[in-house]
């Protein structure tokens, strides 16, 4: 994310980060559709994990060979400090304009932003709430398909049906990130709120459906919503801070995304086993809170670049 932010204008950043997020979506489309081909002897069910490790090595090599050198597009240049005159007292902060403006100087030391920084705190909270909601529904959708379709005694059919539902959801996510965000030129706040609304509707439909078509349709709508939400939250946090702070906020966003998958899936499955509707009530309540609270809290400072 910091690499992309250092090479894009402020107006382009939402689209650029959407494309970055969609690269993860490609994997969620290809993965469920091809995973069963990697079940081969002698590894068996561990086959996909072995292939995942091999792909990781291949990506590492490709990055080393193909990724351009880490030289930001917006380099620091200009005077270290303004000349002491009356005009400089009233001049705007050099970072209030884009990074290629005269006098844009980056700090020599590494930037460490507090988690409670008011510029980005609301975006990180939104990411934490929406990320947990998505992690929960991803954790239970396979069990939901198995239970609602009565596939307890047919595990291979359950795997195929669950994989197909997840494939449909992943394609909906890509539709949002490759189609809707660039076509509609959605701003970060609009992307988060619209995504949360669609995710809420999709979650409700998934929770009340008892056949494959209803579940897959509901999950597709929810995935479409989360596909809008994630790039919006990422872009919002990025746009809230200055260019030289992008590395720190990128690390915080990565932490937020990872934190959602530590406890949330286990909590979702536990609630699902206790009482199926409880899981979807929790997800829906979280998204409803995000929509109501986000309309007031998600704002961008005008001076960030």
Describe every region a protein language model picked out.
Residues 1-8, 228-241:
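Intracellular juxtamembrane helix-capping segments at the cytosolic ends
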Residues 151-170:
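Loop-to-transmembrane helix entry
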Residues 190-204:
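Structural signature of the two symmetry-related core transmembrane helices
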Residues 47-64, 279-295:
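Symmetry-related core transmembrane helices of the 12-TM Major Facilitator Superfamily/SLC fold
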Residues 175-188:
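Helix-to-loop junctions at the C-terminal end of transmembrane segments
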Residues 17-32, 256-264:
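Glycine-rich segments within core transmembrane alpha-helices of 12-TM secondary carriers
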């Amino acid at each position: 994310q910091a690499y992309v932010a250092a090479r894009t204008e402020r107006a382009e950043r939402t689209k650029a980060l959407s494309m970055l997020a969609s690269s993860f979506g490609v994997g969620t489309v290809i993965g469920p559709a091809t995973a069963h081909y990697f079940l081969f002897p002698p590894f068996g069910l561990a086959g996909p994990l072995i292939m995942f490790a091999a792909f990781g090595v291949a990506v590492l090599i490709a990055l080393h060979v193909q990724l351009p050198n880490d030289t930001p597009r917006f380099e620091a240049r200009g005077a270290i400090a303004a000349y002491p005159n009356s005009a400089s007292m009233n001049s705007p902060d050099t970072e209030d304009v884009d990074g290629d403006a005269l006098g844009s100087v980056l700090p020599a030391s590494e930037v460490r932003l507090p988690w409670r920084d008011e510029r980005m705190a609301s975006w990180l909270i939104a990411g934490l709430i929406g990320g947990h909601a998505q992690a929960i529904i991803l954790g239970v959708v396979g069990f939901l398909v198995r239970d609602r379709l009565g596939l307890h005694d047919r595990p291979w059919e359950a795997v195929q049906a669950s994989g197909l539902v997840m494939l449909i959801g992943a394609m909906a996510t890509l539709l949002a990130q490759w189609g809707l965000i660039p076509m509609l030129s959605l701003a970060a706040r609009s992307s988060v709120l619209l995504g949360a609304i669609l995710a809420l509707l999709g979650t409700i439909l998934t929770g009340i459906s008892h056949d494959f078509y209803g579940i897959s349709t509901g999950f597709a709508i929810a995935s479409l919503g989360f596909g809008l939400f994630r790039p919006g939250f990422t872009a919002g946090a990025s746009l809230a801070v200055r260019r030289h702070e992008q590395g720190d906020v990128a690390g915080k966003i990565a932490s937020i995304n990872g934190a959602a998958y530590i406890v949330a899936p286990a909590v979702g499955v536990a609630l699902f086993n206790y009482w199926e509707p409880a899981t979807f009530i929790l997800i829906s309540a979280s998204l409803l809170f995000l929509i109501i609270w986000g309309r007031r809290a998600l704002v961008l400072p005008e001076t960030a670049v």
